[in-house]
Amino acid sequence: MVRGIIRIASLASVSLSSSGFFLYGTGYWDPSDFGVVRIGRAVLTTAAITWDYFTKLRHVEAGTEEYENIKSQVHLRSAHRLLDLCCFNRGTFIKVGQHLAALEYLVPPEYTKTLSVLHSQAPCTPFTDVVQVIREDLGKEISEVFEEFEKTPLGAASLAQVHRAVLQDGRKVAVKVQHPKVQAQSSRDILIMEVLLHVVKKIFPQFEFMWLIEEAKKNLPLELDFQNEGRNAEKMSSIVSSFSFLRIPRIYWELSTKRVLVMEYMEGGQVNDREYMKRNQIDVNKVSHALGKLYSEMIFVHGFVHCDPHPGNVLVRQNPENCAPEIILLDHGLYQVLTESFRLDYCSLWQALIAADKERIRIYSQRLGAGELYPLFACMLTARSWESVNRGIYENTVSKEEIHEIRSNAATYLPEISQLLASVPRQMLLLLKTNDLLRGIETSLGTHSSSSAFFYMSRCCVRALARHRKEKADSLWSYIHISLSETFCLGQLQMYEIALRLQSCIGRWINHVLLWLYLQ
């Protein structure tokens, strides 16, 4: 057990160190700009965490109250060490820390709570550097562009920070300014990461992490181009314009460059802030349902997916006109465009998962690169045990025992998970990350995927597959037949959902009657 914990802690730290390739340096002297300092800090952190687990737990009997108390204390100390490492090395270390903080169904709470500050409270760039970036990119002083400009940022992330400002005409805006030391270091950092990954492979031969650098090479230039982010925001706004609950800030192109993005200012609370929702009378179930609906549409119908929905990028507020919850989607730098063949196979796989069709789960998992590890792949996609997948994930809710089982088994299957990540299409990697972040939000809200979410997901899959078949139809009769089949399937789903709701209502009514009779 101790070895397993040490292994997990070591891998967490090593993964952070091997992911640390967004380093800062443009001529400003900063100790954290030097690779040897960053690597040394990561190695020391890994060693300290490993030694802490080993020395504190090896002489304590596993499963006892004393063991659990000591383990919790070590978790907390280790989490603070990881937080310090993220803040010192910045860049992707912060990105990885944000991701860990969202994995509340998998990572111990001591880690998620400690690292959650990275969602919006990452280390900030000094205001003088912010002024310099705006001066260089816009060719003007801040006072020439803005009537007001708050020196303290609203939030800071791995690549940039956001300030509230007011334009000369009185419009309130949010100004996203890239950290000045990101661009110049990126190429050298990727090289450093390659070296670190080879070292990791020497230590853990069974693990394959080279997909990390492949994704970095592809995504880093896109995330560093804020004009690309602006285009993504406008495209997403157009694609899901029918969703009245979604708000995406307007981009002010005349004031935006590759390093500066000026957009409409929108207020809201973070999507995982239950206290904020309680104060503002926002229904957490409606928020969770809307978020699931939005991402089902993105993934299955359009194949254009916002892949960084950590809580700092998803805000909620109440519509003052109808009191309905609204979702504000921020940070559109990281998107995954799914190929048609991948998207259709993914649709078919989720239909099989929802229907608990084991044979089709095997077929479509293997088509997506899972091979004989398809049961593990299904568990990773659903965050459910294989037993629950076989029973039907929409028919049985996740229990505390199942969550504990998943957490306990995660370490056991780390080599297989690594093998799986190395074999699936690159498109799948960001989808898995997105799924993890969304489930982390669900866990924070206490709203694990409901049957209604699965019904909407099923409808999206039916629509997507039918649209593809209609595009390939070679006759009018074939087109009509596909359309009728689509309508019939959607009608079946609607009737089944209504039946389940009625069953639920009747069950609650019977419970109330029985309780009333008991109290008489």
Swiss-Prot record:
<dbReference type="InterPro" id="IPR004147">
    <property type="entry name" value="ABC1_dom"/>
</dbReference>
<keyword id="KW-0809">Transit peptide</keyword>
<keyword id="KW-0418">Kinase</keyword>
<keyword id="KW-0067">ATP-binding</keyword>
<feature type="domain" description="Protein kinase">
    <location>
        <begin position="148"/>
        <end position="455"/>
    </location>
</feature>
<keyword id="KW-0496">Mitochondrion</keyword>
<dbReference type="GO" id="GO:0055088">
    <property type="term" value="P:lipid homeostasis"/>
</dbReference>
<comment type="similarity">
    <text>Belongs to the protein kinase superfamily. ADCK protein kinase family.</text>
</comment>
<dbReference type="GO" id="GO:0005524">
    <property type="term" value="F:ATP binding"/>
</dbReference>
<dbReference type="GO" id="GO:0005743">
    <property type="term" value="C:mitochondrial inner membrane"/>
</dbReference>
<dbReference type="GO" id="GO:0007005">
    <property type="term" value="P:mitochondrion organization"/>
</dbReference>
<keyword id="KW-0547">Nucleotide-binding</keyword>
<feature type="binding site">
    <location>
        <position position="176"/>
    </location>
    <ligand>
        <name>ATP</name>
    </ligand>
</feature>
<keyword id="KW-0808">Transferase</keyword>
<feature type="active site" description="Proton acceptor">
    <location>
        <position position="308"/>
    </location>
</feature>
<comment type="function">
    <text>Appears to be essential for maintaining mitochondrial cristae formation and mitochondrial function by acting via YME1L1 in a kinase-independent manner to regulate essential mitochondrial structural proteins OPA1 and IMMT. The action of this enzyme is not yet clear. It is not known if it has protein kinase activity and what type of substrate it would phosphorylate (Ser, Thr or Tyr).</text>
</comment>
<feature type="binding site">
    <location>
        <begin position="154"/>
        <end position="162"/>
    </location>
    <ligand>
        <name>ATP</name>
    </ligand>
</feature>
<keyword id="KW-0723">Serine/threonine-protein kinase</keyword>
<dbReference type="InterPro" id="IPR051130">
    <property type="entry name" value="Mito_struct-func_regulator"/>
</dbReference>
<dbReference type="Pfam" id="PF03109">
    <property type="entry name" value="ABC1"/>
</dbReference>
<protein>
    <recommendedName>
        <fullName>AarF domain-containing protein kinase 1</fullName>
        <ecNumber>2.7.-.-</ecNumber>
    </recommendedName>
</protein>
<dbReference type="InterPro" id="IPR011009">
    <property type="entry name" value="Kinase-like_dom_sf"/>
</dbReference>
<dbReference type="GO" id="GO:0004674">
    <property type="term" value="F:protein serine/threonine kinase activity"/>
</dbReference>
<dbReference type="InterPro" id="IPR000719">
    <property type="entry name" value="Prot_kinase_dom"/>
</dbReference>
<dbReference type="InterPro" id="IPR045307">
    <property type="entry name" value="ADCK1_dom"/>
</dbReference>
